[in-house]
Amino acid sequence: MKKRWAAVLLLLALLAGCGSPAAQNKTVLGAWREAGPGSTAAEKTQLVLRLTHSSSEQSAANDAAQAMKTRLEAISGGTMSIEIFANDSLGSLNDAWNSFGNGTVDLRIGTADIPQQGAIMWLPLLADTDKDTLQAACGQGGALRSLFEEYSLEKNSLVLGVLPMQYRVLASNIPVENKENMRQLTMRTIGNGGDNAYWQILCGKTKDVNVQKLALALQQKEVNACDNTLTNLVEYGTYKQVRYLTKLADRVYFDTILMNRQRMDSLTESQQQWVRDAAAYAERTISEAQPGREKAALEKITAQGVQVYELSEADQSGIRSATRDAIRQEYAQRLGQEELEKILQAAGAQTGDTEKTQEG
């Protein structure tokens, strides 16, 4: 009996030892060995950043996210990575912005949560410029990039990259060969002031429709026209519901790579540099691939039987003359005239040129 009790006491002593400091030290030592010589277990613990965007897994936004993830894992030696949530899988666009603001999400690819980006997208019309000039101005060290970074900081966001700009083109089920044809359109609008003002001037009717419901609205003839980039027309399948495409160059669309400022501040200097390097790599990678992506989108659209039109210079000028003042007024009211002029100047519009475009 005494031998049995002795065995029980010995077993209890061994179990108690598992929670002792010596046992804990042994566990840490084991983790250090698994991590490898010359590094601590803490250093080998992978830090994962959460990234969200609203596009599909076949989109440029998702390709940018994947490029950033791959680069970050490589340059950090596997100590950092990115978890990607496409298709607003963490909630709607507003949910995503709320999550981004409260620190639930670390990175976001999409439009910035600032009213100034709307004005920047309309700069081809407002400043009589083109997307390549704007892209350069939004590059590292560019005047627009500096403004963009300043505006985003007010929302606790850091601009890490600006993805390629694309013109929004007109897609319709009524041929639009000239400005007057637009009067026959029931145009889908996206519900913001600039978009509504522009199309209400040009079209017979307008109707706000969420992009996720646009294909159905076209099928049911609630609307017979919409505008978007070539790649987005393909991504959302909208091109299958239209018969005509008319090229326009009054507005661009572009995504930005943004990071929550507090999350960035929580990283070490090395980690911050790795994240910035990964974002710059993603920006370069997508920019290099963009011409091919747009060409492939147009080929897919025309292969569907969609007919493409280009407006005459007279019609393009007429559209700009008819709409420019309304868009200027919209953003002057929203941002303030001084703020709008600052954006125009950053886009390379000199004061004299600005006055000229205002007169139309």
Describe each PLM feature range.
Residues 1-8:
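Positively charged n-region of N-terminal signal peptides that target proteins for export
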Residues 14-17:
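C-terminal motif of bacterial Sec signal peptides marking the signal peptidase cleavage site
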Residues 19-130, 158-360:
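N-terminal secretory/targeting leader peptides
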Residues 131-149:
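A gly/proline- and charged-residue-enriched helix-loop-helix capping module
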Residues 152-153:
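Soluble sensory domains of the PAS superfamily and closely related sensory modules
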